Amino acid sequence: MQIIEITEPKQTDFQQKLQIAVGIDFGTTNSLIAIATNRKVKIIKSIGDKELIPTTIDFINEDLIIGNNKGLHSIKRLFGKTLKEILNTTTLFSLVKDYLDINSSELKLNFANKKMRIAEIAAEVFIYLKNQAEKQLKNNITKAVITVPAHFNDAARGEIMLAAKIAGFEVLRLIAEPTAAAYAYGLNKNQTGRYLVYDLGGGTFDVSILNIQEGIFQVIATNGDNMLGGDDIDVVITQYLCNKFDLPHSIETLQLAKKAKEILTYKESFNNDIISINKQTLEQLISPLVERTINITQECLEQSGNPNIDGVILVGGTTRIPLIKDELYKAFKIDILSDIDPDKAVVCGAALQAENLITQHTNSLLIDVVPLSLGIELYGGIVEKIITRNTPIPIAVIKEFTTYADNQTGIQFHILQGEREMAADCRSLARFELKGLPPMKAGNIRVEVTFAIDADGILSVSAYEKISNISHNIEIKPNHGINKTEIETMLKNAYKNAKIDYTTRLLQEAVIETEALMSSIERSIIKLTKLLSESEISIINALLDNIKDAVQTRDQILIKNSIKEFKSKIKKYLDTKLNINDLRKCKNSNQIK
C-alpha cells in the first residue's frame, strides 16, 4: 500500500464532533473493535471487561450468544467459499458439518432455527461489536474501517462487507491486516526502511514486505496461507495430549491445550492434575508448522528480489510463542519488533485509519496491492495482462482492443486472474459481451477496455466502442473463493512453467499472425482475380497450402520458415497487387473474438 496525499474540503468543528468511526479486526479466533481520538487508540471492551472477543456464535434458549467459545467458530475461513468447496475441503467441512444445509444450491447453515448465509451469521458478530461500542461511547456508531487478510479475494471481501452492512455499518474502507499493523507502527514509531510484517493469527498466516519512508508505505510483496494459524497449533497440542494422557477429543481437552500453549510462552513447563508438558516438547510439536511459515516468508522475500530487511513486525497472538521469534531471527538475522501488543496491532491501525477518514488530522490514505495479475483473453486463448501482480490499488488501466473477423458485430470478453500465458491455465472471473458493433473490417473497430480496482479491492470492468458509443460495465464478483494456498500454488506453477508458457504463447501468436496473413491474401486473390494470371494464382495457393501444413504441425520454426518462403517468392505481388494492410493491423493490435 502507499499513502497518497489527498486534500479534502475542510469540515466544521460541529461536523467533526458528530462523526465517529471505529476500526474492526474481524479475526478467525478473536475480534476487536477500537476507536482513535487524536491518534490515541482505545480498545472497546466487551461484557466481562474483555478486549479480545472470541469470534464464536452459539444459540442457547432462543438467544444468540457471541464470544462464549462455543457453537460456530472460525467463521472467517468460510468467507467467499461455495458449498462445493466446503464439501471438498476436510478442514472447512469439519467447521460446519453439524450445521450444513446440503440440500441447498448455495452455502447455507441451519442455525438459530433458520437457514442462514455466512454473511448473515457473521453480521451477528458485527452487531455485537457495534452494540458494545455504542454502550461505552454513548453514541450511535455507523462508520467503520474493517481489516481483512491480504489475500482475501473479491468474493470474500464482498461477503465481509455485506455482513458489516447487515449489521448497520457503512464500511469506509477495507484494509489488509498487515497493512493496518504496519500503519500502526508507522505512525507510532516513525520507522523508516524495509520491514517484514509476519502476521500469524488464530486461523490465517500473512506475510508482507513493506517499504516505509517518512510516512509512505509501499507494499513490495505479499504471501500467506489462510489455512494455517494458532488454531492449527492448538490441534497439534490437543492430539498430543489425547495420545499421551489418554484424553478424549473434546472441547475441554482443546481448552487445556490452549492454556498450556499460553503458559509455555513465558514458563518452561505446565503441570496440573491431568497433564504435564514442557516448553521443549511444545516446540518439537509445533516446529513443522513454524517451519512452514518461515518457508512462506522466504518465498515472499524471493518474490520481492531479496531486499535488505530492517526489521520484522510481529502481528497476531500466536507470535508470542518464543520459538517463532527464535526461528525468524535464525533464518533472517534481523531485529524483531513487537512493541505493540501483537493481538492489537491490526485493530489499532484500523482505528487510526478510521480517524483519518473522518477528520483533518492527515490527508493520507492506505493502498493495498493486487495479489494476482488480472487480464483478458485474446483470440487464440492468449492472456493479455491488464493489471499486474503487486500493483498498488486503487488503480485504473485502459487498453485498446479490436476485432478479429470482418463484419464482427459483437465481442465476448473473458476476464481472467493468474500469472500464466494461456487462458486455460488461469482462473476465470467473469464473461460479458459487447453487442451491436458496426460491421467493419477486422482491425478497424476500436474498443477501450477499463480495468478499475477500488480501495476495497473490488474489480470492475467496462468496455466502450468509440464509433457507436456502445458500452458495457460489469462488477466482478467471483462465485467462488480462492485461498492463499491456491494463490501460492498458482504462483509456483507460473514460475515452474514460465519457459513452456512463453514458448506456447509465441507459437499461438505465430499461428494467429499466419491465419491473418492467409485470410488477407485469400481475400485479395478474390478481389484481384483479373490482375492475376492462373499460374500466379496457382503459385500463391500452393504456397498457402505449405503454410497451412506448417500450422498443422504446431512447429513455430516451420511456420516462420513457410511464411518467409511465401513472402520471398511472391514479393512482387505483395507490394503491387495484394493488399496486406489488414495483416499489419492484425499484427499490431490486440484482437478479441
Swiss-Prot record:
PROSITE patterns (UniProt xref): HSP70_2, HSP70_3
Keywords assigned: ATP-binding, Chaperone, Nucleotide-binding
Disulfide bonds: none
Pfam families: HSP70 (PF00012)
PANTHER family per the UniProt record, alphabetical: HEAT SHOCK PROTEIN 70KDA
NCBIfam families membership: PRK01433.1
GO biological process: iron-sulfur cluster assembly
Gene name tied to this protein: hscA
Stated role: Chaperone involved in the maturation of iron-sulfur cluster-containing proteins. Has a low intrinsic ATPase activity which is markedly stimulated by HscB.
Domain of life according to the entry: Bacteria
Molecular-function annotations in GO: ATP binding; ATP hydrolysis activity; ATP-dependent protein folding chaperone; unfolded protein binding
Stored InterPro entries: ATPase_NBD, Heat_shock_70_CS, HSP70_C_sf, HSP70_peptide-bd_sf, Hsp_70_fam, ISC_FeS_clus_asmbl_HscA
Protein name: Chaperone protein HscA homolog
Transmembrane residue ranges: none
Gene3D superfamilies registered for this protein in UniProt: 1.20.1270.10, 3.30.420.40, Actin, Chain A, domain 4, Substrate Binding Domain Of DNAk, Chain A, domain 1
Family of this protein: Belongs to the heat shock protein 70 family.
UniProt key word ATP-binding: yes
HAMAP family: HscA
